Amino acid sequence: MKKLLFILPLIAVISFSCQKEIDWGLGGSTSTANQLLVKINSKTGTDSTLLEYFYDANKRIIREKTTGMAAGQDLGNDLVINRNSSGIITSTIQKAAALTAAGIDSVVTRYNYSTATSRYTSSVFDLAIPGFAVTDSAVYTYDANGRITSDAHYLAIGGLPIPLPPILALRNTYTYSASGTNLVNVSQDAATTPGGPLSPVSAQVFTFDAKSNPLIIQNEAVLLARTGLYNANNPAKAVVTNTVSPANDFTMDYTYKYNAAGKPDSSYGTRTPGGAITASKYFYQ
């Protein structure tokens, strides 16, 4: 039981590493409409973060690199995205300061894709932790329009006195705007005991501006746990609810300065409660 309680937060680190302090999926600087987002510089108080994007010759994202600190925490994270000749994601390799601190060099996630339906069906990654081994398998569900509506995560744990077979441990649910162009609600349900029922643990509700999000990768954004990159527009407000610990609830309000292409050039995000302000500058080339 204690090992499971250790593993679940670690799975969360892998799935959502660095997202807490970074405004995923925004863009900026003076640019033309066809330029790519390559860098976001953000600053909150004395903390600063650099987020970089890299692309292949077909302008498909193949790497995301984060450097910086937040409240003394190293946010270093490097996500390499491997694609086949058709552009389908086959695997990712993630290295992060948080993983290194847990004794893990890297995490390789493999993706299964159905050519018959043109959809990603599942993904899996393994963790080798001293004393036991963990396998996380995710299964994706779609709506009639081909949008991912949920991913269910099954954990199998070896090395326990009684090995734990695959059990449903976490489900992320995705709700879209009426137009289908933005993710307006993302919620998480998790089991608190091995094999127990899922119950709500957190949720994020978004409203948007009417301007263009410069980096849009649609369903791939859900696969990569970078849901802000799904949206056609930029978030104007995010309400984050922590069901397990309501004292950690907060709201982010965003204001933007836009470039000639109608994309963000800079932004200010204000957190309530607390009043912390994150100033960001966005660059294309």
Where on the chain are the PLM-derived regions?
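Sec-dependent signal peptide hydrophobic core
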Residues: 5-9
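C-terminal motif of bacterial Sec signal peptides marking the signal peptidase cleavage site
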Residues: 14-17
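Buried hydrophobic residues that stabilize the cores of well-folded domains
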Residues: 19-285
